[in-house]
């Protein structure tokens, strides 16, 4: 039987198993979901890779309390290259369940595509590895290692701390990271570098307690307004990220991302402008970008006539290849502390930067162009 036919025959099993994995609410934040959900997902991953020949499988505790699944599968030749398969089983929180068009933790097919929290990022990639290994059977000419982490979405540094302390255990000739995207549906792409990132929570304090807006608004500083003012300093009117000390003028010299395609991919509403004075590719791949992920403040429904004494926001800073994420994080913190208005106190707390990217391939095994197997599988 041809490999393509074997894969087609395995898709029913892949869908059923992906549905099982998506149903596990593995958000690596105990404030939102019980840790037992991540433990279930880790055990699921371990059990299923045992079915495809991985040995020495174990759950490795990492510095942030999450568990990484490690395993190895020797090939027919010990001298053959070693390939490390990477994925993560944790997912982003669903936020507002009612805003979903399909249930977040129930795999649902719509127009030939499968939807659910983690269906693509990154539980779908776990099933991709499993399905490929089942289809190949014993025809794998390399040695395999596996690492599936459990806190990638939180950016709390579990795997980042684990890797340098277990360098020999994880050493490989190539690392297969499929937590990326294609150029378009049906058009495969090789990602040779990733953005780095840093997460920062900024808190603004203005009053020791709430006070009535009818009596004190005007001269009394509003911490929420101060936070809004502070966040507004992170972009100029054109939408360029303007963190003091970070270069926002670099350009991208690779394949461009067509603006109209980006508008469609990013779901921009009619009439909404793209941000920045560079090309789409410049803004996404060559320059830093700050996103406001969340704000703690009173909801509109139930809000009172009170001046807010404190407010905070969680920020996500993405940095391009070649920019040091630690230095970028430090620059963001310094900017926030300097830009707080009206003498309001501003405090920032950071998570460890999740990645230190570099421009271009790190070594010979990384392809500059798609390998022949991708061309054959895509038929183009």
Where are each of the predicted segments found?
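Short beta-strand/turn micro-motifs at beta-sheet edges
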Residues: 188-192, 300-305
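A short beta-alpha structural unit
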Residues: 316-320, 346-362
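Short, solvent-exposed beta-strand/turn "edge" segments of beta-rich domains on protein surfaces
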Residues: 219-220, 302-309
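Active-site-adjacent substrate-binding region
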Residues: 231-232, 361-380
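Acidic-enriched catalytic cores of C-N bond-cleaving enzymes acting on peptides and small amides
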Residues: 192, 213-295, 323-343
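N-terminal helical capping/dimerization or prosegment-like subdomains
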Residues: 1-97, 310, 314, 329
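Histidine/acidic-residue-rich, glycine-tolerant segments that coordinate divalent metal ions
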Residues: 140-222
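Active-site metal-coordination/substrate-binding segment of hydrolases
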Residues: 80-148, 168
């Amino acid at each position: 039987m041809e490999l393509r036919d074997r894969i087609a025959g395995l898709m029913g099993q892949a869908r059923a198993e992906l549905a099982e994995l998506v149903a596990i609410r593995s958000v690596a934040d105990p404030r939102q979901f019980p840790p037992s959900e991540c433990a279930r997902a880790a055990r699921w991953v371990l059990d299923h890779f045992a079915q495809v020949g991985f040995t020495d499988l174990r759950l490795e505790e990492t510095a942030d309390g999450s568990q990484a699944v490690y395993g190895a599968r020797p090939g027919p030749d010990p001298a053959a290259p070693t390939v490390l398969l990477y994925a993560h089983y944790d997912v982003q929180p669903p936020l507002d369940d009612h805003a979903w068009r399909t249930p977040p933790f129930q795999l649902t097919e719509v127009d030939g595509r499968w939807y659910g929290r983690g269906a693509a990022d990154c539980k779908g990639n776990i099933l991709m590895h499993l399905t490929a290994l089942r289809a190949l059977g014993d025809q794998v000419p390399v040695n395999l290692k596996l690492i599936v982490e459990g806190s990638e979405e939180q950016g709390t540094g579990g795997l980042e701390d684990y890797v340098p302390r277990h360098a020999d255990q994880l050493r490989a000739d190539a690392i297969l990271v499929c937590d990326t995207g294609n150029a378009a549906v049906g058009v495969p792409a090789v990602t040779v570098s990733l953005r780095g990132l840093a997460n920062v929570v900024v808190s603004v304090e203005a009053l020791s307690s709430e006070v009535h807006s009818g009596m004190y608004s005007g001269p009394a500083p509003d911490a929420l307004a101060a936070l809004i003012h502070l966040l507004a300093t992170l972009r100029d009117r054109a939408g360029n990220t303007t963190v003091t000390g970070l270069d926002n003028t670099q350009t991208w010299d690779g394949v461009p991302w067509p603006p109209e395609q980006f508008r469609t991919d990013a779901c921009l509403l009619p009439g909404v402008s793209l941000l920045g004075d560079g090309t789409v590719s410049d803004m996404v791949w060559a320059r830093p970008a700050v996103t406001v992920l969340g704000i703690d403040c009173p909801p509109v429904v139930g809000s009172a006539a009170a001046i807010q004494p404190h407010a905070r926001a969680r920020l996500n800073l993405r940095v391009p290849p070649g920019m040091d994420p630690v230095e970028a994080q430090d620059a963001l913190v310094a900017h926030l502390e300097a830009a707080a208005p009206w003498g309001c106190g501003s405090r920032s707390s950071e998570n460890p930067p999740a990645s230190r990217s570099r421009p271009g391939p790190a070594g010979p095994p990384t392809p500059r162009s798609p390998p022949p197997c991708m061309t054959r599988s895509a038929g183009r």
